[in-house]
């Protein structure tokens, strides 16, 4: 591919296109990948479709002002994002250790973007072009639009609008608002006069002209009073709906952050149009010498079938970004993309995914949403399925069958996650059976996250009984179709509400499973999530009940170690945790014990542990007692398990 297949990145590109001045310049923290899994590509192509000229400055050197000047001054303004991930999440682990890789950068190496990229980029643009309008968007801006707890500072920060000095913030899915804002700028309206576009947030000196709004506790209040913080979050959480949501206002000293109600979800026709735009579908050629961009590997042969999620997991911020209403593409649109993939020179016959945030949420949760919006005080699938929930996999199954029939397609995988409780609510097992037959390869990754019902309740996840029923059914189906396929559960330690007792309960469950997870995710308090609010305040903002928070680093290490109790280096922490919790009954050589009395020799541990794990599997796995399963295959399949992102 040549540079002409991409949006312009240099003066040479502008000259070839006979462009003197660009209308917009997108500055992004990711490398430039022209694929619909990347927000920069979507916004750039949407604006191009509307007749605007758009250039890309990807990962500029923030210590060199000339990098921000290389495409000149845009006619209408700069559009700034940190990339597909919040820059702080991208740079640091849950234990605040610096990451050494970055899948969104050349060669997968870190160091191509600054911490708090949106703020840094905006400040540099203001330095280069003082009067040029700046619009910020993407996940980092979207989830930091109000005063928010910042895990890395361990304090409440102001709205990112205040810290970045940007003129306007677009939150959530940006296609509709960016088109409306850009057209207003084209018609001659000044950026500081654009105040009525849904899906935008701006700063105002006074709010006398506003009508029908809710003022939430101010920055000064939420930064000094945790009850006020919880109250502010609760209001934000309930008002993120395009039909019933109101304008929200939060005072920051003498000014106000004003969030307009969300944009309506994209229609199916609009979704189809977005994904039919002329993407190059790969990274820019300038990265070839550096090894390309690793992030393209997971998405190049994957298909986004829909956006949004009504699962409402507490630790996920999708409610604030993509919303609870499903926005899907038509089958024709998806089939065209699948057919197009088969003609790509490096296509090997495998489509890696057909899904979204939750693969089997292909349609809206209920018909009520279409007229009245999402329910304010009720979730669709938690704590149990709403009576209005439409449980049906028929359309999704029909789509998958059609893709399987496309010439040169050998296999269609589902990797974006299956909501197992929704799957269990479906009385028709046809989808479940074909999922096991055609759409997984040896193992299915699912996310029970925990096993303690009190923790699951705070996570917004289904109870242990639901997961147990799913596991049994999964293995029953695999037995019927004569397949030796396994489950790889995602598990999380140190989530709000998880004390040592709950962690030990999960460790005992893992013992009965018969193998130790190779990767365990510590709870990560990222901006915008309900769980992060619990973590900071010690309060569940939706119920106002107090929540136990494992903040002590020693206890967090204990909880993590308990989930991998057979690892030699975890022995001392596990023993200390069991003694602290008065569970010495789990220390010894009995069948239910997690660790022996004495620390094993490290050299022989791996061999002995593998043997012990297999014995536990044969004796204690209630779901698989009579199945002829190769233990070697099981261990091999688990070794492929990658860390959750």
From Swiss-Prot:
Protein name per UniProt: UPF0313 protein CLI_0267
Note accompanying the cofactor annotation: Binds 1 [4Fe-4S] cluster. The cluster is coordinated with 3 cysteines and an exchangeable S-adenosyl-L-methionine.
SMART domains: Elp3
NCBIfam families: SAM_YgiQ
Molecular function (Gene Ontology), one example: 4 iron, 4 sulfur cluster binding
Organism listed in the record: Clostridium botulinum (strain Langeland / NCTC 10281 / Type F)
PANTHER family recorded: UPF0313 PROTEIN YGIQ
Record-annotated Radical SAM core domain positions: 295-566
Listed Gene3D superfamilies: tm_1862 like domain (3.80.30.20)
HAMAP family hit by this protein: UPF0313
Region (Disordered) residue spans: 598-645
The protein's required cofactors: [4Fe-4S] cluster
Pfam families hit by this protein: DUF3362, Radical_SAM, Radical_SAM_N
Basic residues bias spans: 600-609, 632-645
InterPro entries per record: Elp3/MiaA/NifB-like_rSAM (IPR006638), rSAM (IPR007197), rSAM_horseshoe (IPR023404), UPF0313 (IPR022946), UPF0313_C (IPR024560), UPF0313_N (IPR013704)
Alphabetical UniProt keywords: 4Fe-4S, Iron, Iron-sulfur, Metal-binding, S-adenosyl-L-methionine
Protein family: Belongs to the UPF0313 family.
Biased composition, class Low complexity, residue ranges: 610-624
Residues that coordinate or bind [4Fe-4S] cluster: 309, 313, 316
């Amino acid at each position: 591919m040549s540079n002409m297949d991409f949006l312009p990145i240099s003066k040479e590109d502008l000259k070839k296109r006979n462009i003197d001045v660009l209308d917009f310049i997108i500055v992004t923290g990711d490398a430039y990948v022209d694929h619909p899994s990347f927000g920069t590509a979507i916004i750039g192509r949407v604006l191009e479709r509307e007749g605007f000229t758009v250039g890309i400055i990807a990962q500029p050197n923030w210590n060199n002002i000339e990098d921000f000047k290389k495409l000149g001054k845009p006619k209408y303004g700069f559009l700034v994002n940190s990339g597909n991930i919040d820059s702080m999440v991208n740079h640091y682990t849950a234990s605040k250790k610096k990451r050494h890789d970055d899948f969104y950068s050349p060669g997968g190496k870190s160091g191509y973007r600054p911490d708090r990229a949106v703020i840094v980029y905006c400040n540099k643009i203001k330095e280069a072009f003082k009067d040029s309008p700046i619009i910020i968007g993407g996940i980092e801006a979207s989830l930091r639009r109000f005063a928010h707890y910042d895990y890395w500072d361990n304090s409440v920060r102001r709205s990112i609008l205040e810290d970045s000095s940007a003129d306007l913030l677009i939150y959530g899915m940006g296609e509709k608002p960016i088109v409306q804002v850009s057209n207003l700028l084209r018609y001659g309206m000044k950026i500081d006069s654009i105040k009525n576009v849904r899906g935008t947030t701006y700063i105002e000196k006074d709010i006398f002209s506003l009508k029908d709004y809710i003022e939430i506790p101010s920055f000064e209040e939420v930064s000094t009073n945790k009850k006020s913080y919880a109250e502010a979050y609760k209001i934000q959480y309930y008002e993120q709906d395009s039909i019933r949501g109101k304008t929200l206002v939060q005072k920051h000293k003498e000014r106000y952050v004003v969030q307009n109600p969300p944009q309506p979800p994209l229609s199916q026709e609009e979704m189809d149009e977005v994904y039919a735009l002329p993407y190059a579908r790969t990274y820019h050629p300038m990265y070839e010498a550096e090894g390309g961009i690793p992030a393209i590997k997971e998405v190049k042969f994957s298909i986004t079938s829909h956006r949004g999620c009504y699962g409402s997991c507490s630790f996920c911020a999708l409610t604030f970004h993509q919303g609870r209403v499903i926005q899907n593409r038509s089958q024709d649109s998806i089939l065209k993309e699948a057919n197009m993939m088969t003609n790509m020179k490096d296509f090997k016959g495998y489509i890696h995914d057909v899904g979204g945030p939750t693969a089997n949420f292909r349609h809206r949760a209920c018909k009520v949403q279409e007229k009245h919006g999402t329910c304010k005080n009720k979730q669709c699938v938690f704590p149990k399925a709403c009576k209005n929930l439409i449980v049906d996999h028929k359309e999704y199954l029909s789509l998958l069958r059609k893709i399987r029939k496309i010439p040169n397609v050998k296999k269609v995988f589902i990797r974006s996650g299956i909501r197992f409780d929704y799957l269990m609510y479906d009385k028709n097992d046809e989808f479940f059976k074909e999922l096991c037959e055609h759409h997984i390869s040896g193992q299915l990754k699912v996310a029970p996250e925990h096993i303690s019902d009190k923790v699951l309740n705070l996570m917004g996840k289904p109870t242990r009984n639901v997961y147990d029923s799913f596991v049994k059914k999964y293995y029953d189906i695999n037995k019927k179709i004569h397949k030796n396929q396994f489950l790889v559960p995602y598990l999380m330690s140190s989530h709000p509400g998880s004390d040592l007792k709950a962690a030990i309960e999960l460790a005992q469950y893992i013992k009965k499973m018969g193998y130790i997870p190779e990767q365990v995710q510590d709870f990560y308090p990222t901006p915008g999530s309900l769980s992060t609010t619990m973590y900071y305040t010690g309060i569940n903002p939706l119920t106002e009940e107090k929540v136990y928070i494992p903040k002590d680093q020693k206890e967090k290490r204990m909880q993590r170690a308990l989930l991998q109790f057979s690892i030699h280096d975890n022995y001392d922490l596990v023993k200390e945790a069991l003694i602290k919790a008065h569970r010495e009954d789990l220390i010894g050589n009995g069948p239910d014990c997690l660790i022996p009395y004495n620390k094993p020799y490290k050299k022989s541990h791996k061999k002995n542990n593998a043997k012990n794990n297999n014995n536990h599997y044969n004796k204690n796995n209630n779901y698989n007692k009579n199945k002829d399963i190769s233990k070697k295959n099981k261990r091999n399949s688990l070794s492929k398990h990658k860390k959750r992102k």
